[in-house]
Amino acid sequence: METKAIIAALLMVTAANADKICIGYQSTNSTETVDTLTESNVPVTHTKELLHTEHNGMLCATDLGHPLILDTCTIEGLIYGNPSCDILLGGKEWSYIVERSSAVNGMCYPGNVENLEELRSLFSSAKSYKRIQIFPDKTWNVTYSGTSRACSNSFYRSMRWLTHKSNSYPFQNAHYTNNERENILFMWGIHHPPTDTEQTDLYKNADTTTSVTTEDINRTFKPVIGPRPLVNGQQGRIDYYWSVLKPGQTLRIRSNGNLIAPWYGHVLTGESHGRILKTDLNNGNCVVQCQTEKGGLNTTLPFHNISKYAFGNCPKYVGVKSLKLPVGLRNVPAVSSRGLFGAIAGFIEGGWPGLVAGWYGFQHSNDQGVGMAADKGSTQKAIDKITSKVNNIIDKMNKQYEVIDHEFNELEARLNMINNKIDDQIQDIWAYNAELLVLLENQKTLDEHDANVNNLYNKVKRALGSNAVEDGNGCFELYHKCDDQCMETIRNGTYDRQKYQEESRLERQKIEGVKLESEGTYKILTIYSTVASSLVLAMGFAAFLFWAMSNGSCRCNICI
C-alpha cells in the first residue's frame, strides 16, 4: 500500500510540474443576452442594440421644413374654404400636416366629399399651395352671394352658391384655361334641396342640369330633392366634388341651377412627406430626421419601435422591444476551481475574465509564471465579419424598402393612395423580415465563434503533435519545458516541434515508465492479496471443523 501511495504522488508531481497552455475566449460580467433561431436569451459578452426606442414627444421640423398645424380646421375645411379657417387662406408651406383631435371646422354645410381620402392624400403630398381665382364674380349673370346659417351666415371661400337673379336662372356657361405651370385643384358642389318649394325658391327651375367637363372628366349632375335628417340645422345636402386641371387644359361648366360654382382653386407645388398626423402633441423648437405621431427622433440605428407611421429619414419599424446583435462571444462564466490556473477555463467549459485586446486567446503556465495573450488575428477577423454583418443587415433592409417605394412612385396618384392604405401590411411584413434576418445572423455569429475557438485549438494541437497531451479542458500539458519565448512560438504559429521532440520523448517515456511500474506493482499486490485472502479463509474453515468435531456437533465416518 505504501508503494501505491508513493507512485500516485509521483504522478501528481509530474503532472503539476508540466508546462501548460490553454486555448479559450473572453468572459465578462455582462448580463447581455440575444435571441437566435433555436435559443432565447443566450448570454453573450457584448451586444449591439439595433433598435431605437426613444422619442422627444414633440412635433418638429424635418429636412423638408416645418409642419402645417391646422388647429380647429380639417384638411377638407381648408381646401373648400370653411369661413372659420380664414387664417389659412394666405397660402402655406409644410413638410407634413397636423390635424387636431378637436378639429370641428370641416364641411359646414352637411354633405359628402367624393373621394375624400384621395383628396386629402393629394393635398398633403404637395409642399405648398397658392389660391388662384378661377371664375370672377362677373362670370355669372345670376346671384352669387348665397350663404347658410350652417356656415355662420357665410359660405365657403373657394366656391360661390349661385341662385336666381330677378326670378330668372338662365343657363350659365363658363370656361377657364389653366395657364399656370402647375396643376390647379378646383372644387364644386351640387345642392339637393329638401323640398320642391325650396328648389323653385332658390333656382326657379324645377328641373336642372349641371355639366362639368375638362379633357379628363365629363360629369353631369341632377339634384335629388327630398328631406334628410337635420344636420347643422339643415335638411338639405351638398355633394362636394373636386378635380385637377392640368396646365393647358380648359374647364367648362354649364348649369341652370343647383350649382355650387368654383371660385378659387389651389395651385399645388413641390413635394412634402405626404403625411397627415392626427395628434395633439405640442409644436416644439426642434429639427428631427424622423417624425411620428408620438414624437420626433434622431438616430443612426437601422430599426425603431416608436410607430409604424413614422416618416422622414427613418429607420425601419419593428414592433419588438429589443433587437440585439451579438458583437462578442457566448458568455460562459469562468469556472472558479481550476487548480493550477485558478479562475480560468478552456473553450469547453467557460471563458477568461482577464483576456483583453481580443476575444480568443491563450493562457499558459511555466517556470516563469502564468501569462495570458489574445490571438489578435482571429479576433480581428471576427470583428470585421460582425461589422460587415451589421452593415449587411442595414443594406438588405434598405434595398427591400427602396424597391417597394420605387415601384409605387411610378404609378398613378390613386395607387399611391392605395399604397398608404396597405402601408400597415407592408410594415408588418418587413418587420417580420427584419426580426428573422437578425435571428439568422445571431445564430451564424455564435456558431462562428464556437468554430473559431475550435479552429484555434486544433491549430495548436497540430503544431504540438506528440510533444503534448490534451487534458480534456481545452488545455495541453507539454512534455518539455517551455519558457515564455517558447509559448509565444506556439501562439504565433512558429513552434518548432523537432526542437523539443527528444526532450518530449524522454519525458513521455519517463511518465509511461512510472505508469508501467505502477501497473506491475498493482498486479503483484493483487496476487498477494488474493493468496492471503484464500489462506485466511482455509484456516478459518479448518478451525471451525476442529471445534465442531471436538464437541460432537460434527462427526466424520469413513467407509471402506
UniProtKB/Swiss-Prot annotation:
A lipid is attached at C556, C559 (S-palmitoyl cysteine). Major glycoprotein, comprises over 80% of the envelope proteins present in virus particle. The extent of infection into host organism is determined by HA. Influenza viruses bud from the apical surface of polarized epithelial cells (e.g. bronchial epithelial cells) into lumen of lungs and are therefore usually pneumotropic. The reason is that HA is cleaved by tryptase clara which is restricted to lungs. However, HAs of H5 and H7 pantropic avian viruses subtypes can be cleaved by furin and subtilisin-type enzymes, allowing the virus to grow in other organs than lungs. It is a single-pass type I membrane protein. Disulfide bonds join C22-C475, C60-C286, C73-C85, C108-C151, C290-C314, C482-C486. Keywords: Clathrin- and caveolin-independent endocytosis of virus by host, Clathrin-mediated endocytosis of virus by host, Disulfide bond, Fusion of virus membrane with host endosomal membrane, Fusion of virus membrane with host membrane, Glycoprotein, Hemagglutinin, Host cell membrane, Host membrane, Host-virus interaction, Lipoprotein, Membrane, Palmitate, Signal, Transmembrane, Transmembrane helix, Viral attachment to host cell, Viral envelope protein, Viral penetration into host cytoplasm, Virion, Virus endocytosis by host, Virus entry into host cell. The record marks R338, G339 as: Cleavage. Gene3D superfamilies: 3.90.20.10, 3.90.209.20. Palmitoylated. The chain crosses the membrane at residues 527-547. It holds the Pfam family Hemagglutinin. The lineage of its organism: Viruses, Riboviria, Orthornavirae, Negarnaviricota, Polyploviricotina. Belongs to the influenza viruses hemagglutinin family. It comes from the Viruses. This is Hemagglutinin. Binds to sialic acid-containing receptors on the cell surface, bringing about the attachment of the virus particle to the cell. This attachment induces virion internalization of about two third of the virus particles through clathrin-dependent endocytosis and about one third through a clathrin- and caveolin-independent pathway. Plays a major role in the determination of host range restriction and virulence. Class I viral fusion protein. InterPro entries: Capsid_hemagglutn (IPR008980), Hemagglutn_HA1_a/b_dom_sf (IPR013828), Hemagglutn_influenz_A (IPR000149), Hemagglutn_influenz_A/B (IPR001364). GO terms for molecular function: host cell surface receptor binding. Residues 548-560 are cytoplasmic. Homotrimer of disulfide-linked HA1-HA2. Residues 1-18 form the signal peptide. One of its GO terms (biological process) is virion attachment to host cell. Glycans are attached at N29, N141, N218, N298, N305, N492.
